[in-house]
Each structure stands twice: as C-alpha cells, then as structure tokens.
C-alpha cells in the first residue's frame, strides 16, 4: 500500500510532496542526479510530487545544461519553474548599468548587499521571495503534506520554511554539501552566532528529518546540534542503475594501449597539476602504460565556459596522451565508460569531501586510482573494493606508482576479481540508499494542522 492522505480537490489521495531544488534537469550540476533520483523515487513509491526549480534559461545561459536529463523525470511529476536572475554572471553588456560599466567594484559591493538583504547567500538570496510565493501558490492549489528542500543553494530551504510556519507542513532538509561547515578544511564557513548560524539552528530545530551525503558530515552536525541528532540520517548519493556503466568482467585487448578516464566536474580544489606530473612520469616508467591515454570528460570549472587555466594545463600534456573531451549527457555515460580500462578519481582534499561519481565508478568493476587526500570521505566508500589503488600522498612518485599498479591490474585482473568489484558496488545503488527514508516518510501523523505550526522569528 502506498502513502495516502486526505483527497485533494481532484480526488487524489496520495501524499503530496513538494521537492525544492534550484538545480534540477536540465541543470548539469553534480547535485542534479541526486535531485532527479530522489524525485523519481518518491513518485515510484506512490507519492504525488511537485518540483520547484529554476527556469531552463538559468542553466542554458549560466551553468550549462544537459537537455537529455529532462526526459528522465517521471511523467507524473509536476515541475514548476521560477525565473532566476544572476546579475554577476550576465555577459550581455547591453544589460549592464552605467555603474557596473564605470565603477565595477562599487557595483559588485552594492550587488552583494542586495543579494544578502533577504537571505544570507550571495547570488541566491534574492530568489527567496519568488520561491516562497511559488511554494505558497502550490499549497493553495493542492495542499502539500511534506516539503523536501535540497541545498545548495541554501535558499531552497526557505520554501519549506514558509510552508511550515504558515501551514504546519513538515519538511526534510537534504544537504548535498554543508552550510556552516567548510568540507575542505573542516572550519566554519560563517561566523559562530552569526546570521547563517542562527538561521540554520532554527531550521534544523523544526525539521522532521535532515539528510547528509556521508557519515563524517552527519557526525559533525550531530555534535553541533545534539538535540537534532536523532533526526539526522545519511542518504549517500549512490549510483543510478538506469544510467550505471556496464561492469567490465574481461581484460582489455592486449594489443592496444590502455585508456584511463575521468568523468565529472574538475574544480580548482582538484589536484589536476599533480596528476598531470604523475601521469607523465608513470607513462614513461611503467611498461603497462606505454602509449596509454588519459581522457577527461565533463566540465572544467562550474560554469558553461571551461576554465582557461585548466584547459591550458590539459592541452600542455597532449604529448603525454592527455585529452579533454567536454561534457557528456547523462544518457550517454555508459558508452563513454566503455572506452576506459581504468578510472581516475580526482577530488579536493578534506575529511568531509565525497563525490557522487565514486559510486558510479565502483559499478564498472574497473581499477580505480584515488588521486586525493587519503582521509577524504570517498576513501570510506571504496575501502574494500578489490581493484582500488589509493595514493598515500600527492607527490609525483606516489601518483606514478598508483597509476602503474592500476595499469598492471587492468591488464591482469581475473574475472573473479572483477565480479567481486561489481558485487561490492551493489550496496551503493541509489534506490537502496533512499528506500529507508521513503518508508519512514510514508506515514505522516499530525502532518498538518488547520492553525499551522508554532511560528518563531527568523534569524
């Protein structure tokens, strides 16, 4: 029996979930796959789902889009799109004010103050008003039983907040990253006791559940908010079976050079320079890497235009067999993975850093070279994977040795070892990660009152 609720005006008795995510298809951001999978999982479990997200133009103009993802949203899901303005990324000079033209520093400071006036998030703060208005409009048309807001940006939480304050709608905070915690250095992103800190404490205190992508981030928040700890859960990203690469259970053709591959977004936190040095050394010293290729697929930086510095670095190593191939639609990922004999996992440093691609990588059954800080949370995921080759440091020699070991495994690992890799990955299917939470939310006693929830003051 699926989740049920009182009938709406059209007679539909299913629980109505409002899912809020700035980045939803056709966005190409890393978090879009979590949003897509979560929405589809709610719909498949019998919930009636409405999504609040930004207009398509937002992604087409500013961050890049993957149009193929829209076809993957289940047809019964209703998607409501809200215009989003991003002045700082506006490149059309005809839309620039005179102040921006002739006093850009003054314009940036004024824009920053405007951004955070209603919500403390540069670039995204102004979206609060249209987001809240849209959430209330959805609720007026068909009462919402549960709101699930996925951040970042954290302004997404405001839609759930306004429904809870005015109508008593319970909500889930789904942290794809963190708000106060700097996941790279473990410090604070915002001042203790400041506006963000107060706002987060208030929102956490009223949340029905709080989801985090890994145990280190959940533990950090549980220690900081012990009264909310029992409602905090890990919902790992996992891999999506419908997009997952096909496990490779046979070694590559011994007559051709090996191909190593990376798929994802390379940020400035990733040790790309260290990798290129290690790759060049490994290719000249390890026999299994003779004439080997390394392909980078995805985005160089977070925006639609590739980072010129990263692109120059990759192109400067063309003679070492390193090439950049650009973004790949999610629906074509399997074909790209089929090109590879081993995988490169490049991540930024930090105990709290994880990655969605690590689960997808594991599903391939291929050797995986972890080129990141050994204490990175991704190491917790891969520990026990039979063909995992982590570095102990990021020196040229350590990277070269790990690449050489992975190349030898790519050539000689037997079918049993590869099958064990694929079996290891099964635990990280995204539907298995989501199932316990959806089951827990299927029954929402006292979910909504006619008078609304107790209202506190915003920080």
Where are these regions (language model features)?
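N-terminal subdomain of nucleotide-sugar transferases
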Residues: 1-87, 209, 282, 286, ...
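Membrane-proximal helix-turn-helix segments that form the acceptor-binding/catalytic region
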Residues: 37, 118, 122, 133-136, ...
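Acidic donor-binding loop of glycosyltransferase active sites
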Residues: 208, 319, 323, 337-352, ...
């Amino acid at each position: 029996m699926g989740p049920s609720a009182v009938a709406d005006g059209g007679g539909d008795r299913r629980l109505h979930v409002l899912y809020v995510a700035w980045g939803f298809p056709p966005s190409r951001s890393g978090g879009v796959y979590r949003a897509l999978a979560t929405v589809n999982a709610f719909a498949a479990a019998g919930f009636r789902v409405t999504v609040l997200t930004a207009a398509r133009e937002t992604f087409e103009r500013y961050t890049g889009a993957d149009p193929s993802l829209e076809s993957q949203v289940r047809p019964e899901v209703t998607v409501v799109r809200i215009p989003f303005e991003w002045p700082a990324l506006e490149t059309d000079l005809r839309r620039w004010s005179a102040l921006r033209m002739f006093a850009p520093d003054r314009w940036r400071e004024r824009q920053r103050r405007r951004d955070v006036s209603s919500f403390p998030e540069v670039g995204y703060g102004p979206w609060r008003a249209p987001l809240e208005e849209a959430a209330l409009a959805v609720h007026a048309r068909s009462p919402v039983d549960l709101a699930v807001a996925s951040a970042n940006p954290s302004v997404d939480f405001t839609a759930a907040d306004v429904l809870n304050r005015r109508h008593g709608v319970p909500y889930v905070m789904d942290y794809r990253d963190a708000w106060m915690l700097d996941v790279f250095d473990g410090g604070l992103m915002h001042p203790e006791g400041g506006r963000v800190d107060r706002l987060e404490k208030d929102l956490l205190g009223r949340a029905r559940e709080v989801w985090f992508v890994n145990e280190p981030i959940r533990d950090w928040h549980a220690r900081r908010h012990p009264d909310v700890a029992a409602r905090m859960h890990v919902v790992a990203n996992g891999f999506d079976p419908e997009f997952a690469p096909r496990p490779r259970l046979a070694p590559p053709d011994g007559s051709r050079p090996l191909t190593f591959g990376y798929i994802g977004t390379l940020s400035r936190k990733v040790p790309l320079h260290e990798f290129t040095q290690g790759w060049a050394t490994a290719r000249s010293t390890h026999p299994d890497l003779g004439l080997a290729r390394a392909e980078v697929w995805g985005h160089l930086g977070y925006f639609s235009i590739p980072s010129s510095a990263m692109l120059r670095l990759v192109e400067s190593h063309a003679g070492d067999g390193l090439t950049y191939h650009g973004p790949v639609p999610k629906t074509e990922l399997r074909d790209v993975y089929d090109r590879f004999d081993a995988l490169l996992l490049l991540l930024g440093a930090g105990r709290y850093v994880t990655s969605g691609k690590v689960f997808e990588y594991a599903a391939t059954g291929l050797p995986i070279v972890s080129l990141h800080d050994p204490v990175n949370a991704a190491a917790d995921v891969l520990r026990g994977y039979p063909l995992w080759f982590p570095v102990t440091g990021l020196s040229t020699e350590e990277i070269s040795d790990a690449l050489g070991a992975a190349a030898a495994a790519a050539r000689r690992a037997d079918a049993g070892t590869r099958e064990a890799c694929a079996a290891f990955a099964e635990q990280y299917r995204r539907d298995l990660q989501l199932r316990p939470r959806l089951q827990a939310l299927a029954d929402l006693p006292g979910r909504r009152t006619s008078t609304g929830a107790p209202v506190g003051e915003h920080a």
